[in-house]
Amino acid sequence: MQGYFTQRLLLTIPTFIGITLLVFTLTRLVPGGPIERMLAEAQLSSGETASSAEGFGSQSLSEDQLDQLKAYYGFDKPIITSYLEWLWKVLQLDLGESTRYGESVWDSIIERLPVSIFYGVTTMILTYLICIPLGIFKALKHGAPFDHASSAFIFISYAIPGYVIGIACVSFFAANLEWFPLGGFVSDEFEELTLWEKIKDLLHHAFLPLIAYMAGSLAVMTFMMKNALMENLSADYIRTATAKGLSFSSAIKKHALRNSLIPLATHFGQNISVILSGSFLIEKIFNIDGIGLLGYEALVERDYPVVMGILVISAVLYLIGNILSDICVAWADPRIRFGEAK
Amino acid sequence: MLTPQAKKRWIKFKALKRGYYSFILITVLIFLSLFAELIASNRPVVIHYNGELHFPTYGDILPGTSFGYDYQWEVNYKDLQKQFNLEDKGNWLIMPVIPFNPLESDFIEGEYPPYAPSIESKHYLGTDMAGRDITSRLIYGFRIAILFSLFLLAVTYIIGVFIGALMGYLGGTFDLVFQRLIEVLSNIPILYVIMIVASIVTPDFWTLVLLLAAFSWMGLTWYMRTETYRENSREYVMAARAIGASHSRIIFKHILPNSVSILVTFFPFSVVSGITSLTSLDYLGFGLPAPTPSWGELLQQGTANLEYQWIAISAVAALSFVLTLVTFIGEAIREAFDPKKYSYYE
Amino acid sequence: MKFRKINCAVMFLLLSISIQSNANTLPADLSWENNNNAKPWASPLATKGGKFTDFILTFPPTLRTVGPDSNSSFRSYINANQLGLTDFHPNTLEIIPQIATEWAYGQDGKTVFYKLDPSARWSDGNPVTADDFLFTLDFMRSKHINAPWYNNHYTNEITSVKKFGDHTISITGRVAKPKEELHYYYGLVPTPKHFYKKIDKNWVKKYNWKIIPNTGPYQISKIKKGKRITFERKSDWWAADRPLNKNRFNVDKVILKVIRDTNIAYKHFEKGELDSYALVLPEFWHNKAKGKLYDNGYLEKFTFYNNSPRSSSGWFLNTDNSILKEKPVRIALAHALNFDKVIKTVLRGDYERLQAFHTGYGEFSNKNISARKFDLKAANKILDEAGWQQRGGDGVRISNGQRLSLNLVYGRKEHSDRWSILKQDALKAGIEINLRLQDSSSHYKTIMQKQHQIASLGWSTGFRPAFWQHFHSENAHKPQTNNITNLDNKNIDKDIEAYRAETDSNKRVKLANALAQQIHDSAVFIPSFKVPYTRGAHWRWLKFPDAPGTKTSSTLYSPFGDGGIFWVDSKTKIETKAARKNSTKYSSVNKTFDQYRENTSD
């Protein structure tokens, strides 16, 4: 078992290099890098209104000056050289500097980390809190009206994209009814509030985004739970247990439930990287300054160091998550022995 | 012909009413959408002109000159219909139920688009911001989305099953290398790749199918791999190997047919994810080029203009209706293929 | 048409200049001008106080105004509070004083002398002196600021800055120009020498988030990264008592909130969290700006017709393309595009058709030119005669096996609707147009590589029409230049060169008009739309002078620059908030101001 995990840990290295090298190469192939963006901004009219500009966009730059810009953005070397330089820096935990904000990528990410973690973790906890009981209940009442009604509801919420639900919530509950704030992570005067008010303020802001976040994952988890439990309920060992006189409810508690949690546990590990990335569309709608939005803006604005920085973190989390989910499964089901099947 | 086992499953599937009816409904919808030109189009289904019948739905345009107008471009059938009625010379034409094609902007004099749903104007679900009929766009959008997801599914299944089976069957280095490749691919931000491709060539239907397929075949591979592992150690495979069956024969004749149940249960969910992916891409503007009819684009218009509720409502209703149908089918298939009968305790 | 600030350098160079310049003596025969009688455009009714909240879509990437990523929309807020030597009167376009109180012109036609206001102060209390202007030149020429355009401009265009005592300077440019253009192209904005001291290679990083001392009415007082930026009015601003500044810059605080979605921002406005909302886009003006808040008069709508250079937006036809190199095809295409239908439908009749490449430049625009009208008969006739008479089964014309099918690249998703309407009518002329939306960076790259067939875009405006960059053959057939139609015409070249060399205003006007005609005749540019107005809605507590804007206003809600003429009436604010609670009604307000409206026939 220990050998298996060591091997898995070692295998993450080529994977990590594969991921980052591929994306790094892609950033070089994209037409319109930071330099083009800079040139475009200098010359094009940005809006529909008559705008005035500096009037010296007319001058083209000399080769020397273009080279200077290329060097500033690190585009002056062959891909593999700059990749190795980048990798060397990453190994020293230096993710470089954002070409757009000019500040350290680490700082940008860390600044937004609390927000993303808050939403990621809360969404996950709430999803588990709702899905597990709901899944159990649906499994026990399989085929009953409640099962059908809740299935229909869950499917519909699954079918509508989270960002659409978000927009609908904002326009209805926040704008029309004014029950909730229009967005943001906390109020402007957050610092002046007492602890209790702070918590209230945070939850007040978080309510609608959480609904939008949860809408999608609700269906998957609930059905995973329901199916797993139903499978286990029909398994021989439950029949045996009830036949031996164990009451049905304790049979569920003692055996079926625990086994049914295995698929959810697998899911947990894989979810770790999702926690952080969030959904940039939901973040945009609710004006939440999270990692998802940072990544999307960086993509659109061709801020490659930030793109790569976020990729490094999400890749590392994904790889750790995979190993973690193996551990979770092993813990939830002592029968599973990794690395021995071969 | 159906094997007895398949027949049993089919009977069981039919017994699950919700899934079965959803299946029938969606099949009918797909079938109808293949003939969308007869349902929603600016071209009549049939024209009777000077004793001759024309069927302009498919094929070349009929220029204005062929009906006595002085212009070379496609005849305006709405004008033609009015003229036929006015002249009363025995000429007639039958328009489809929805007399608009999805790309056509229909403007009402003195009013600005979007136009609200109205039976009189024949815009049964209203129009979008550019005056295009929403019903027509939904129908064509459905055809594109469902075909897109079916093709996507075909490609991902072929790649996923093939590689998954080989990984499980061959094991060893092959397995190890592809495991890494899958890990690498599942970490590439797909939106990013699509943005890059979109900036080099405008993505068309097939580019998008292949692009998405390249990054979504991995999910199935894991299941296929485990399944092959399991089947591989069964007696019948060992027996086949013992009598000298070739690798390809073992995979195709023995392992694949026995893994079919897992493939089929994933079917509807792949369709759902195909439709959702295309919709989100269109929503963000990285999907099929404008003015292709698309649900995502309609959704985008609807959410940006919530005052005109019919746009968002039509898009969301259509999307959730179809996705819910497919999910119902999926649930029923899963149950029909489940070898274990569920026990119920009262 | 604001007089744009052209900011600031290498220490040793600076020293040498100032030592040398101390020895300078003023020419004796200068005749000083001041324009102290310019007419103010603010209202005496204005009262000071209150705060004004607006929104920005993204948090600015830096507070620097030069160097990488400084060209965000936020820069205008900082620049507006960094005064130049002179400015242009927003209504009359006369030269008006800023830091300079008087100016005079040299004999060579390329030098301007300025007397600085001795009371001018930086926001940190230090006086603004001639050295700050000399420093600008060093600063802008420094490699360390990583701004090659600025390096070029301040090296090639501005030849020297001389000091005649602490409060008098002269600026000499490369070539002689008409007087007002000397101010526009050669005018300088001071750079606080005492603050920067030295420009080294860390400059870009070091000054990313530093608040630079300024000379304008407001200064940034608080920054909450990613969320908001607050400007505060200086209580003892040195120029507050100037006649042109009186009754302006009334609010105490200007708060810019970051809201990333315009729809959500509008909801903030309706809640009263924002004081105003610009509603230039037809979708917003007609769809969103209605309902109880407007009917009850809490929100007021203003449409203000302005008159300033219009962005040269439209379709650019690449003449290096095998189909578009034929002029008849270009002319036919122009006749096959029904821009008026787009205006009448999705643009709701608000926008107007742009008639030529340069409009709104006063007499420099050729008002006799009008864009080719939508005319299918003409388009079809031209194409029939040009050898495209054969049509395929889909109605698209064919010549020598080639379909008349063209790709249009554009960079804004919102424009898809407009172009799909044009596409439908163009097909009637047998022209197929394929819409190719690209994200804005790749769009620009495609065009700069000259890989497009048709490109839709809008060039930003300048002080005077610019021909050389867009139409001279020197910029054709090669990447990274602005001649994106690859127009290559010897006669046009000759006139452009003459236009560039001319210093006499009247002759320049003539040349500009002649050039405009030639460009129209070449049919390489199909003008699309112009927005002849600025408009928006605001809460009724925001009060305005009788004319809420100026001839050149691009928005009515600018708190800085040549704006700042509105004020917040705190009594009305309390009253309105109470009225909203108990549904008291006021009369609804929807005003149009067309005193500066262009004659629509031009």
Sequence positions of predicted segments:
Chain C
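Ligand-site clamp/hinge motif
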Residues: K206-W209, W237-A289, K423, L427-S440
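N-terminal lobe/hinge region of extracytoplasmic solute-binding protein
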Residues: L26-P40, K51-Q107, D138, P213
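Gly/Pro-rich hinge or "lid" segments in bacterial periplasmic/extracellular proteins
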Residues: Q82, H89-E94, Y186-R248, K253, ...
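Detector for C-terminal structural segments
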Residues: N35-N37, I56, Y77, K224-I229, ...
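Extracellular/periplasmic solute-recognition and catalytic clefts
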Residues: K143, A147, S221-E232, K257-N321, ...
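Aromatic- and charge-enriched surface segment that lines or borders ligand/interaction sites
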Residues: T101-N146, S170-T172, V258, A265-H268, ...
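Surface-exposed binding/hinge segments that line
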Residues: K115, Y150-K198, P217-K224
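Alpha-helical secondary-structure segments
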Residues: T53, T129-T136, T168-T172, P178, ...
